[in-house]
Amino acid sequence: MYIRRSSRTHKGKTYTNYVLVESVLTPKGPRQKNICSLGDLQPRPRAEWLALAHKLTSALSGQAELLASQTPDSELQELVAKVQSARPLSSTEDSARRVAAESDLVAVHVDQVRTEESREAGPVHVGYQFWLRLGLDGILAQAGLSERVRQLTCVMTLNRLIHPASELAMPDWIRSTALADILQIDFRLLAEDALYRNLDKLHTQRVAIETALAERERTLFSLDQTVFLYDVTSTFFEGLALSNPKAKRGYSRDHRPDCKQVLIGLAVNRDGFPLAHEVFAGNRHDSTTLDEMLTALDTRVGLLPGQTVVVDRGMSGEENLKKIVARKLHYLVAEPYGARSDWVRDFENDEDFSEVKRETSPTNPFQRKSTIRVKVRQVGEETHVLCLSSERMAKDRAIREAHEKRLLVDLEKLTKRVAKGKGRGTKPAEVLESIGRLKERYSRVARYYRMEYDSQTKVFSYSLDEAKRVKAEKLDGSYLLKTDRGDLTADEAWRIYTLLTKAEAAFRTLKSPLGERPIFHHKEGRVEAHIFLCVLSYHLLISIEKTLLNAGVHTSWATVRETLKTHQINTIVLPADGGMVLRLRQGTAPEAAHRDLYQKLRITSEIIRPHKTWSTAEEASK
């Protein structure tokens, strides 16, 4: 530091002022920074000005030694007080004072330094930051849930996101992570009963929470609300679930017809964000759930005239289409496979087909996309889109040939059994029952085989209807879309329909990575709360992946989670002189891969602020 003299003249009078100046190094080179105005000081030789500046520097840095000078000590003290009142302490001075006050500058027994209580921190840190970004704590508070319920809902949701476990195992997982450090909550006494009770409290407010969350995500990510994608899946129970009236046996997408199940209906937008979900009885047909879901959507996000509902062929019946139109909405659906028979000639005719231009995946630029060709046919006010897929053609042919091969084997077995005329399954009623089962089991190919049984002669025979098989071969790789929107080209209609994979991807994620199935709860409310908890965790997951996608990063949450598992929190134990032990609780230094992900996700890499604790060696040993 040094003292600079400045003068200015006003109305014929000259005013002199002395300023304490510090030289600082900036990216553009050394610069002078005014620290404080010292006022009008006594005139003195230049050497004494330098000595005074040195004394001020020494006094401000806390040094006791002062240089001898003609300047009175009272003047120095006055100048020090003036400078201190005019500026905050520098980081160096502040650090020096803290060191002096807390005696952190200590001698450490290096051979006794150790780390303890290491906890996985990276994934829970990201999950909690997105919990805050989505404003979930405030949303739960607006729903009337207490602070304790909000805290437990947070950790239960993060468990589903990171390492799904039952409520019985969840407390141990929570204690194995850095959640206690991040949330500043003691989970040492947390038991599963508290988590079960929390599900009961959460269940009553799920509609209000889902409504507020959908609006928050819409504004946060600028989401499109013109297209709704709806699909249904099933999830099965372990046990009989006698106390749940919705637990029924039905068509199982999980290939568990032996278990009771419930149906889950989920509506998402074109970016894959959930808008509404409902839980239905396990024996209901998909088509019977659409009207209830439209009502739920109207409650959660509000339906507006002109929006488009996209559903798969299982819900594309005329009754459902009338319900969609009655709400002044548009529809885009896949027609049942049987409807293709009316369009065989159009599928055979290559004219008017145009190829859909498909971009390669950023994560796999060398992947070969299947060829998709589409064309439009107008029937009244409806637009029919005929689609041909090269990949699906090969798949359909392989499935059909495999089914036909197995059907022929079973037909030969039935023929031999009937010809033998003895034993089980040879009575006329039993033979007819066997024929019915074969037609049901091999419905894809049985329709072009004639199966006949003469109860008088007790002869069973079958024959191939070649015309029907040729017709089926011509439809390999084809499917049919239908919409009441006249403004869509064939290409646009196909692209909107394929967005339905967003709902299918959500179901796959809910069932496996987020641990939605199987369900061990039996009470209806807890089952629905369990499913809602999985949906909440999916909100976090899709928000994380959407943020990365917006940053140009095409990766999954599973990859992010595995990468960040090595970012931890631990306690460094530093035995010091005098029988004292310093414990420093802090996060490990993030690696380059960690910092890159945190930057892309726009969250801090500092998980917690370092926390220091002093204790005696005797206390530390306990």
Describe the predicted segments one by one:
Residues T71-R98:
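Short, flexible loop/hinge motifs at secondary-structure junctions
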Residues Y2-R5, Y15-N17, P27, S91-R97, ...:
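Anion-binding and metal-coordination hotspots
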Residues K55, E75, L79-K82, D410, ...:
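Charge-rich, solvent-exposed alpha-helical interaction surfaces
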Residues R4-A59:
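Short, surface-exposed polybasic/aromatic micro-patch for ligand or macromolecular engagement
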Residues L25-P27, P45, A51-L52, A59, ...:
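Acidic, glycine-enriched active-site microenvironments
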Residues G39, T57, S61, L67-A68, ...:
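Compositionally biased amphipathic helical and low-complexity segments enriched in hydrophobic
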Residues R44, A59-Q63, A86, W173, ...:
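Conserved, well-folded catalytic cores of nucleic-acid-processing
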